[in-house]
């Protein structure tokens, strides 16, 4: 049985420890998860061997923790999802693609800061 793990980030809401998940997407679940999301989704197209991808990962964890009620954070491993990589024209990693209502609304290629990402996410809400 193929189970996809998701990274759990601890979040304190109302004094209770809860979790905001960073969703792992692949070719089998991408379209459904993107189209059914009631909130915008920031998808990180990354590679495990990519230094800048590893550098932006803690930033995405922070955003998931702080903004988890208004946005979802997801990751796609480009080496394991070549059809998605081709479909969205991913040529460099990290590439961050912003979705709302199942449609691409914005994209950032390369390493960027938390403030820029939050600003872009706010334009989607």
Put a short name on every predicted segment.
Residues 1-42, 47-72, 80-83, 87, ...:
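Proteins that catalyze or organize thiol-disulfide redox chemistry
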Residues 75:
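Conserved residues in the N-terminal Rossmann fold of short-chain dehydrogenase/reductase
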């Amino acid at each position: 049985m193929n189970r996809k793990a998701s990274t759990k980030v601890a979040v304190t809401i109302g004094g209770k420890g809860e979790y905001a998940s960073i969703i792992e997407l692949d070719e089998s679940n991408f379209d459904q998860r993107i189209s059914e999301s009631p909130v915008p989704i920031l998808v990180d197209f990354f590679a495990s061997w990519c230094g800048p991808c590893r550098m932006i990962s803690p930033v995405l964890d922070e955003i998931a923790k702080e903004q988890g009620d208004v946005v979802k954070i997801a990751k796609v491993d480009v080496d394991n999802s070549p059809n998605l990589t081709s479909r969205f024209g991913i040529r460099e990693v990290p590439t961050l693609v912003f979705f709302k209502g199942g449609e691409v609304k914005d994209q950032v290629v390369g390493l960027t800061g938390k403030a820029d990402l939050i600003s872009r996410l706010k334009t989607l809400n």
